[in-house]
């Protein structure tokens, strides 16, 4: 069954006997100062099909990125991670939380199927601009551009 899920998307699948040791699991999310602004980058990339680990990392990091003192621009890096409906719903629930008002959200490393899942999950729930950009540098530019997040 897993083979069928990943047959067209091998970059999001990795057979690993110790998934908790994957570099994506250990990669830290962080605030990046950029062009006079700040962006929170939530690194969920390189975690392949280990959705439980992705959601656990997201929940752990959410205690930080939902703080009022953290940037209201956020980028979710999802390269080389299998994005499931459960993960999309978890991200949508967190970024639509009333405790934090995000201005701009960018999803980096998504294909058209994943983009459609995010659009459906955020429909009538989002109070912010969001975009899908596969280039990290372009995503940074979009997140800090004045016209995007006003």
What does each model-found stretch correspond to?
Residues 2-150:
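Amphipathic, Lys/Arg-enriched alpha-helical "gate/interface" segment within cytosolic domains
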